[in-house]
Curated annotation (Swiss-Prot):
One of its GO terms (biological process) is base-excision repair, AP site formation via deaminated base removal. InterPro entries: UDG_fam1, Ura-DNA_Glyclase_AS, Uracil-DNA_glycosylase-like, Uracil-DNA_glycosylase-like_sf. Its EC number is 3.2.2.27. This is Uracil-DNA glycosylase. Transmembrane segments: none annotated. Keywords: Cytoplasm, DNA damage, DNA repair, Hydrolase.
């Protein structure tokens, strides 16, 4: 199974023409993130057959020079978002590695699908592209990973991500849940949750190569 087959299956069962038309107008008349060529970058960098981990985000960062198609990641010279800074703090506390770049392309190439549930946003307007069709698309993506892959770790931070648990077969995958790493909730159970070591211990127990979370 490849992404092209997954996408074909989804688009034969759902009509995304209205969303496509809306986005064409938005990209023509508004500033929208990420750049159009980066909307599907998570799928470009993480082949379906290589997925080991899915980290779910919500919608892209809505400031300039941030979003580039990977959940939680920002472009290499962008300012660190607070949630990502907290993710890195937990990474250092969990497995002792220190990351300096806010760009998570290396994680994506390691088999970590960094998936937002909504893939576009208008500049300065969080959640502005909710309910245009993206949720249907990404719910189907989660379902496809659950159905056609084995022993994937799904990392669900915060309540919106955890609502997607219903699409995941827990008999053959691991779900890691905690509060979101945002400053509003990180101290309510995200810190100390050890998602990175838990993920790698599970992957090793299933005979898979662990994720290299540290910068190489």
């Amino acid at each position: 199974m490849k992404w092209s087959e997954v996408f074909h299956d989804i688009t034969t069962r759902h009509d995304f023409q209205a969303m496509h038309d809306f986005l064409e107008k938005e990209y023509t008349t508004q500033t929208v993130y990420p750049d159009k060529q980066n909307i599907y970058q998570a799928f470009d960098l993480t082949p379906f057959e290589d997925i080991k981990v899915v980290i779910l985000g919500q919608d892209p960062y809505h400031g300039p020079n941030q979003a580039h198609g990977l959940a939680f990641s920002v472009q290499p010279h962008a300012k660190f978002p607070p949630s990502l800074r907290n993710m890195y703090q937990e990474l250092e506390n969990d497995i002792g590695c220190h990351r300096t770049s806010p760009h998570l392309q290396d994680w994506a190439r390691e088999g970590v699908l960094l998936l937002n549930t909504v893939l576009t946003v208008r500049q300065g307007e969080a959640h502005s592209h909710r309910n245009i069709g993206w949720e249907t698309f990404t719910d189907e993506i989660i379902q496809a990973v659950s159905n056609y892959r084995e022993h994937v770790v799904f990392i669900l931070w915060g309540r919106p991500a955890q609502q997607k648990e219903r699409f995941i077969d827990t008999s053959k995958h691991l779900i890691i849940k905690s509060p979101h790493p945002s400053p509003l909730s990180a101290f309510r159970g995200f810190f100390g949750s050890k998602p990175y070591s838990t993920t790698n211990n599970y992957l090793k127990s299933k005979g898979k190569t662990p994720v290299q979370w540290c910068e190489s």
